[in-house]
Structures are given as structure tokens and as C-alpha cells.
A protein has these predicted regions:
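Short helix-initiation/N-cap motifs at beta->coil->alpha
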Residues: 132, 187, 225-236, 248-252, ...
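Short, well-ordered beta-strand elements
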Residues: 24-35, 73, 82-85, 104-107, ...
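Aromatic- and charge-enriched surface segment that lines or borders ligand/interaction sites
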Residues: 73-117, 130, 136-138, 237, ...
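Short, solvent-exposed loop/beta-turn-alpha elements that line the ligand-binding surface or hinge
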Residues: 46-77, 153-189, 211-219, 256-268, ...
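Ligand-site clamp/hinge motif
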Residues: 210-256, 384
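Detector for C-terminal structural segments
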Residues: 26, 198-202, 207, 274, ...
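Alpha-helical secondary-structure segments
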Residues: 101-107, 132-138, 190-191, 219-222, ...
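Surface-exposed binding/hinge segments that line
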Residues: 76, 119-170
Length: 519
């Protein structure tokens, strides 16, 4: 890590004035880098982390999950269907353009056309420009999650992204896993500008001199994001001083990090559910509820949480973690090998069958090891698994094609709400609305769809919770998916890199506010 006194600091010291701010140059090692620079191409942790660095949302969560004003200074409800947002004035994009309501409306419309994000904004009718610095978000019906959804509106530079590129293609086009102007060009309002990017090698960021948030104490002027897939290699880079911060820290490495001089380990409980989906379209056996139940009973997820995750995870029996509106304390993990064998026999598969499985090897903590363990467990009920693991850059295109019989996916609820988990993972797939966008199990239950639709217009918290709990019970009984665990979070950093105030349960550290002291 390099520390350098800013020109302002030098000038102040030359004038005999005290100034303790230092400009930091740090390197952060993650398990993988963002797959694209288009903030709407993929709904993933890597994309959202990039968004919080290069863009700003209208509002964001603080560490207590309270809403914090960002590009919207304030907001108020106009009527049951309308929330009004008052925008900050004088906010500049990296291009030099000034942010206005036009950019917010343009971004909202683009989100509604994004295959990955449209489901979040399906309850909305439109965004309306009231004046240059006022925008109304209008929902189709009463909707209780407007502010939660607004955390996903990162205003884009509409002038920068409008028109044609050198190949005659629309600059605003969203191309999944392909080449587009937005996937390689970026202009936001955030604390950092992307100055260089080599996919799979590094992304270089430089602090935006005209950043609007002058109250931020962040003093990182240069940041390099470096992907290091292997857990042990990532830790070694931190301990040797090659990098200044790493994420995640695998459970096996916690003691190494905690025991190192000048290094801190910061942990938080997590709400990201890790699951396997069972593709009913690719393997006829998985259409039988008894087979799906047998698979759930055969996978010892409590053992995975204890041994592979070293206790740094909570075994799950449902989608919703404790504290979410749909969480049902009665839906517990249910490993029972004998029960699994009985169900296989009852379904006519006593001798088992074969299936394919895919999983990433650098997206979730110990993802490949978990997949290998699950495959071994399924062999005990006669299911022969052909497992393939791959880096996430190759994994997501395969997942989007639902290219296996069982597929690993983790999900952190975008709105910190139970309904979001179902909307993306277990509702009936609908390309028009975006519902079920990541439902490669092709599970479809009209009652689940109906309950979620009703929950999205229910403003009574108790009634809404009852609807969401009923959804979890149906998914549990149908064995709609294989719940594994809720993944906890861990970061490691040099002690003078103060990450505790910027990390959060969403797993999007607010690097713009990061303070680094001189050693």
C-alpha cells in the first residue's frame, strides 16, 4: 500500500496548518472481478459492488438497514401509489455532465427492460419527471417496498449512454454475456472512476475529483481490484503485504488471519441463501416430488455447514433467514438418509439414476467443495452425479441456459425481503415480467405465484408475513429447491485499513468512505 500526501495537504502544511488526511493507494483482492461494466447486465454481487463504487443509488442502506439519503436528498409519499424523490443539485457524472431527473427516468426505464432487473421493478408503472430535480415513482398498486427498490436505482449518465457506438449499435443496449458499449464504457456519479480494466486480471479505480459527497471521510485516491480465485493464495497475498484487503476470507483461513500481526478479521452474519436447483425440464426424474424430496433428505446440509464451512454458516430449511417476514421457525433442515432411500424406492428409483450438476468455483465460499460433497452424498441413494465446476465468468452463461440437472445458486434478497427470493428463484419463469429469472429448476406453482403477487400489494405487515410464510411452507413440502445454508461474511485487512465502518450484511463495502491511516 502506498500513502501519499495530497497537493492540498502539502499546501496546508507549507502554510503551517495541520492536516491529517492522507491519500491512500490500496489493492483489494476479491475471489472474482465484475463480469461487465454495465450495471444492468447481470444482477449479481460483483455488479452491485461495482455500482456502489462507480455510481450512487437514490438511497442506500446503512449498517442498521436504515435508509440513507444519497442522490435523493429527501422523499415523501404523495399518495398510495406515488413516492416523490427530491434530487441533489450540482451532482456531476464522470463525463462532466450534470445529473438531473432526466437521468433518473432514463435509468428507471432501462431497468424495466433489463432481463435481470425487470422483476424488481415490475410492480412499478412509471417514473415521472416533475421538474429537473424531482422524480415521482408510481406503482401499479399500493406497494410496500418502494424505498427498498430505490436502492437499486443508480442513475446512469443518459447523455453518455445515448446515440450509436462506432459499430452503429445503440449505446444503451443491454447485451447479456456479450459485447456492448455499456459493458466496456462507464460514467457514473460515484466516488471512483474506472481508469483501466483487464478482465480476470485487475480493475483500476481513481477517486473522482468532482465527487459530490464532500462530507465523506474516505481518503482512498487509487484502488486496484484484483481477482484471486484460490482462498489460500488470497490470504497469503494479504499476509505478505501484497494486498491491503481481501474478501471473502474462507472459514479455514480465519485463524491464520486473526493470528497475524497487523491484520484484522471482520465478520458479520449473512442472509445469502446457498441452494441447488433441480431442473425439471432436463431430467424427468426431477419432476417427481418424491425424488426432489429424497435429494433434499440425502444432502446433509448441517454437516456441510459444520465441516466444510467450519460453522461459519447456518444450515437452512427454507429461503428466508431469521428476521425476514417469511421466516418460519418450524421449517428446519431435514437430513435423513433412510427417509431419502424410502422416497427413492417409492418413486420407482430404488436403483437410482444419473444427473448432471454444475457449480462455480470462485463465486460462493467453498462452492466447489460443497458441490463435491453434495455429489458424494447423492451417491448414497444411487444418484450418479456428473459434476463440473468452473469460474463464474464461464458459469453464469451456462446457468442462464439452465445447462444441467442440478445447478448451484446463491441469493441475497435485493430488497431485504422474503418475496424477492421467491420472485427470482421459485416463481414461474416469465420473460415478460422477469419473474423466475433465475428459476432453472423450472418449478411452477400457481398458488406460490398468487401469494407473492398478493404479498406485493399487502401493506398490513401481519397479513403479509402470513402470506410469505405460507409460500415457504409450500416450497418446503414441494422440495422446490435444495436449501444448503445462509453464508456468513468475512473480510480481512491491514489494521490501518479501517473496513469495519464500511462493510455491511449486503456485502457491498462502501469503498468511497474507506479511511486508511499511515502506518
Amino acid at each position: 500500500m502506498k500513502m501519499m500526501k495530497s497537493k492540498l495537504a502539502v499546501a496546508l502544511m507549507a502554510a503551517g496548518l495541520s492536516f491529517n488526511a492522507l491519500a491512500a493507494d490500496i489493492t483489494v483482492a476479491y475471489d472474482a472481478d465484475p463480469v461487465s461494466m454495465d450495471p444492468h447486465e447481470q444482477l449479481s454481487g460483483g455488479t452491485l459492488q461495482l455500482s456502489h463504487m462507480v455510481f450512487d443509488p437514490l438511497v442506500r442502506y446503512n449498517q442498521q438497514f436504515e435508509f440513507e439519503a444519497r442522490l435523493a436528498e429527501k422523499w415523501e409519499r404523495i399518495d398510495d401509489k406515488t413516492m416523490r424523490f427530491h434530487l441533489r443539485k450540482g451532482v456531476k457524472f464522470h463525463s462532466g455532465n450534470t445529473m438531473t431527473a432526466d437521468d433518473v427516468v432514463w435509468t428507471f426505464n432501462r431497468l424495466q427492460n433489463s432481463p435481470d432487473f425487470k422483476a424488481i421493478f415490475e410492480p412499478f408503472e412509471k417514473a415521472v419527471k416533475v421538474d429537473d430535480y424531482t422524480v415521482d415513482l408510481v406503482t401499479k398498486n399500493a406497494f410496500p417496498l418502494v424505498l427498498q427498490s430505490a436502492t437499486y436505482i443508480f442513475p446512469m449518465d443518459s447523455k453518455f449512454y445515448s446515440g450509436k457506438d462506432e459499430n452503429g449499435n445503440d449505446k444503451s443496449a443491454i447485451v447479456k454475456h456479450g459485447n456492448s458499449y455499456a459493458s466496456t464504457h462507464i460514467s457514473g456519479t460515484g466516488p471512483f472512476i474506472v481508469t483501466a480494466r483487464e478482465q480476470g486480471v485487475k480493475v483500476d479505480f481513481e477517486r473522482f475529483a468532482d465527487y459530490w459527497d464532500k462530507d465523506s471521510k474516505g481518503n482512498v485516491d487509487h484502488l486496484t481490484l484484483k481477482p484471486i480465485k484460490e482462498n489460500a493464495t488470497r490470504v497469503a497475498a494479504l499476509l505478505s503485504g501484497g494486498v491491503d484487503m481481501i474478501a471473502p476470507v474462507a472459514p479455514n483461513d480465519h485463524d491464520r488471519v486473526k493470528g497475524a500481526d497487523g491484520i484484522d478479521l471482520v465478520t458479520l452474519p449473512g442472509t445469502r441463501i446457498i441452494t441447488f436447483q433441480m431442473n425439471q425440464n432436463s431430467n424427468p426424474a426431477l419432476k417427481d416430488k418424491r425424488v426432489r424430496q429424497a435429494i433434499v433428505y440425502a444432502i446433509n446440509n448441517e454437516g456441510i455447514a459444520k465441516r466444510i464451512m467450519k460453522g461459519f454458516a447456518t444450515a437452512a430449511g427454507q429461503q428466508s433467514p431469521e428476521g425476514y417476514a417469511g421466516y418460519d421457525a418450524e421449517l428446519k433442515p431435514r437430513y435423513d438418509l433412510n427417509k431419502a432411500k424410502e422416497l427413492m424406492k417409492e418413486a420407482g428409483y430404488e436403483d437410482g439414476f444419473s444427473l448432471t450438476m454444475i457449480a462455480p468455483n470462485n463465486r460462493y465460499v467453498n462452492d466447489a467443495k460443497i458441490a463435491q460433497a453434495a455429489a458424494a452424498m447423492l451417491s448414497k441413494i444411487g444418484i450418479k452425479v456428473d459434476l463440473k465446476t468452473m469460474p463464474k465468468a464461464q458459469y453464469w452463461p451456462e446457468f442462464d441456459k439452465c445447462a444441467a440437472d442440478m445447478l448451484m445458486i446463491g441469493w441475497h434478497a435485493d430488497t431485504e425481503d422474503s418475496a424477492n427470493l421467491t420472485e427470482f428463484l421459485t416463481m414461474t419463469r416469465d420473460e415478460k415480467t422477469g419473474k423466475g429469472q433465475y428459476n432453472c429448476g423450472h418449478y411452477s406453482n400457481p398458488e406460490v405465484d398468487k401469494l407473492i403477487t398478493e404479498a406485493n400489494t399487502e401493506t398490513d405487515p401481519e397479513k403479509r408475513s402470513a402470506e410469505l410464510k405460507k409460500v415457504e411452507r409450500i416450497l418446503y413440502d414441494d422440495a422446490a429447491f435444495v436449501p444448503l445454508h445462509w453464508q456468513n461474511l468475512a473480510w480481512g485487512a491491514k489494521s490501518n485499513v479501517h473496513i469495519t465502518p464500511i462493510v455491511n450484511a449486503m456485502n457491498f463495502p462502501y469503498f468511497g468512505d474507506l479511511v486508511v491511516d499511515e502506518k
